[in-house]
Amino acid sequence: FSVWAELMDDDAVEAAFGALAAQGVGVGLSLPSVRVGDAGFAKLTRKAARAGVPLRIWPLLSPEHGYWIGETNVAETRDLMASLLAWRSRRGGPVFDGVSFDLEPDFQYSEALRRCARLRPDRALSLLLDNVTPTRFAKARASLARTVQTLRRAGIVAHAVTYPVVLDQAVGDTTLEDALSIPVSGIDWDEVSFMVYQTPIAQLTGRWFGPALVRS
């Protein structure tokens, strides 16, 4: 079991290590691409290791490159993972057990979908259908699969996190993944998790469901 740390400063993350270790809880620690090579970040990961807190890196690209990992930025993702592995191998580099791939529509596409859902829900389906490009998707998935294999050969756990809607696809079908630009199936992950955001569901229903929603 792990918690996620995205917008916390290093001191706040470090302050939580004692409680996390006592509960046997790991942390998925966000790594903005601009912090690759940051000595302070590497030091934080070593402190987690000394505290007995399992740590996975959660890489995030710049907003201009999509922020989250997906179909449109597999080249940037490949380069980011190569830099991460090189940094890990150097003296004073970070210590981590795995890498979590946050597979979501890229930032610009996510914003377009959000605007449609709020202002013109009748256009949302057309936007999704326009994004279905099987050849481009297949090439992106193959590229991401190679990146994942590179990590695994280096002894790093490759963990995918994505939308549960992909579970509604028929076996062998990737249309929903393609529509959302989130290649997940057909890649040799060590582990796959599915995210459920409470806030938008509460906004739609007017009700806060709590942990039971995630369990469902």
Tell where the protein language model's regions lie, with residue ranges:
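Acidic-and-aromatic substrate-binding clefts and catalytic sites of carbohydrate-active enzymes
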Residues: 1-13, 28-41, 63-75, 108, ...
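An active-site-proximal structural segment forming one wall of the substrate-binding cleft
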Residues: 71-103, 175-188
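Glycoside hydrolase catalytic-domain groove-lining segments
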Residues: 134-159, 179-183, 187-216
